[in-house]
Amino acid sequence: MAPPLLLLLLASGAAACPLPCVCQNLSESLSTLCAHRGLLFVPPNVDRRTVELRLADNFIQALGPPDFRNMTGLVDLTLSRNAITRIGARSFGDLESLRSLHLDGNRLVELGSSSLRGPVNLQHLILSGNQLGRIAPGAFDDFLDSLEDLDVSYNNLRQVPWAGIGSMPALHTLNLDHNLIDALPPGVFAQLSQLSRLDLTSNRLATLAPDPLFSRGRDAEASPSPLVLSFSGNPLHCNCELLWLRRLARPDDLETCASPPTLAGRYFWAVPEGEFSCEPPLIARHTQRLWVLEGQRATLRCRALGDPVPTMHWVGPDDRLVGNSSRAWAFPNGTLEIGVTGAGDAGAYTCIATNPAGEATARVELRVLALPHGGNTSAEGGRPGPSDIAASARTAAEGEGTLESEPAVQVTEVTATSGLVSWGLGRPADPVWMFQIQYNSSEDETLIYRIVPASSHHFLLKHLVPGADYDLCLLALSPAAGPSDLTATRLLGCAHFSTLPATPLCHALQAHVLGGTLTVAVGGVLVAALLVFTVALLVRGRGAGNGRLPLKLSHVQSQTNGGTSPMPKSHPPRSPPPRPQRSCSLDLGDTGGCYGYARRLGGAWARRSHSVHGGLLGAGCRGVGGSAERLEESVV
């Protein structure tokens, strides 16, 4: 019976090990080695009692909760150099005994808050060589108290869970090198008393905030837990913000300065402390005074220079710091925007620029001009308040709403789309901030506002509707008469005018086409006359030279300079070949056809010009085409 029992035990042991893997039973622990096996997923028949599971150098793409279910005794899990792109929620939920987790060399781009939940006793977490761009703030929460080594190097991280990392009291090694980190929160390493190695090489750090952790690396013998700090390969900005680091005197490091230009490329520890300087802020330009209508957007600008770049703040008229809200936005570049201005937004704003070298301030005044509303009156009570266009120019012409001593508003130089509004100040009155023009047309009842500076006494209205009636009123905006008013408005006068109708293009087209037709006709006659005159001169000159009728060119033979040419042979007379109707041979013979050809040429030229310009005339104005045709016939 012994041999069959032995075979059964061997068979059961072989079935517990996945086919492509190698299983080693070393005393009480079981190791499953599945590296370099070409696996596409975690083998489902791995012994649940496995203590060490190596799945490195395969092609596994995703991890899920069933892959490691009930492996409560697993201590070491290696998944390095696979193609893992996704880790499901609580994939390691049953690995309560796990001490070491290697996920380096994969294709992870993100770790969620529940991706690493489960291994509460994890001590070594290796995530280097991935494509991580984000790690959720709570990703490390399950093993904050137990983690000793954390490696997230060679990724694309701009931020890491600083709050979680700063709460790891047992952390010994932290590798953050070769990422895109550009800032460290102040005091983030203050609680890491056991940290012995911090690697920040090749990031984008321009400055480092003072931290007690860095002083432990200055004297390794005196420090109870010396720190090995590396931060070379960063674009350090060597100014007063890094003076504390320069005083640590670390002669073995090879950091260099990237800026300012005067220190660029110099060895960090060789720069004298006196050259680590800053420049106080200087307000380069800012908005001094801004006037806006009630309800409009207000943009206050403030620009400051300094080293380092100043931080910008705004203080409102109520001496409170202006922050981002549903109505206002304060941008880092010093711009303050108020979306919809109201009466309470008016006042003096203060722009504050600060940096470690000092601060600078600038005052910006915002004036909010209240829109005219029906029923408003100024503090004096005797003058009309903000105008409503409903009290039209017709009412104003009857003497309602204007004072006789005030000059009337005039609209002159009216065209189809524009009109010039003119006015005067008349007798001395309250100081005027600016003028406001209100108008609307019979085509559109929408009220249009125009703001004009106080120094102007005329304004050109553009983009008016042709052939429309307009009502226009002019108001003067003056300083507030009382503490509760923002502006006081005074009606200067109203006017009524009408724009001209749209001008037809027919007359312009007639003049253009008629002028072109006449030019072509006269040109044709001149060319024909010149051609006839030239032919006549040639005929007369040849006849006077020979004293006889000129021979036709077809009866003349050419001769060379080499010898005598043979006498022309006599031929019986023959009738000349027929000539084309539209050609004239200058053979010094019968020239009667040339005169006719010249006249036909002039007529054809005139008819061609008529076909071009006459078509336009026919399409635009038929009467002009007929007159042009009669003109061509009379001229030709």
Swiss-Prot record:
Residues 17-48 form the LRRNT domain. It is found in: Membrane. Disulfide bonds join 302-351. One of its GO terms (biological process) is regulation of postsynaptic density assembly. Keywords: Disulfide bond, Glycoprotein, Immunoglobulin domain, Leucine-rich repeat, Membrane, Phosphoprotein, Repeat, Signal, Transmembrane, Transmembrane helix. SUPFAM superfamilies: Fibronectin type III, Immunoglobulin, L domain-like. Residues 569-580 have a biased composition (Pro residues). It holds the Pfam family LRR_1. This is Leucine-rich repeat and fibronectin type-III domain-containing protein 4. The gene is Lrfn4.
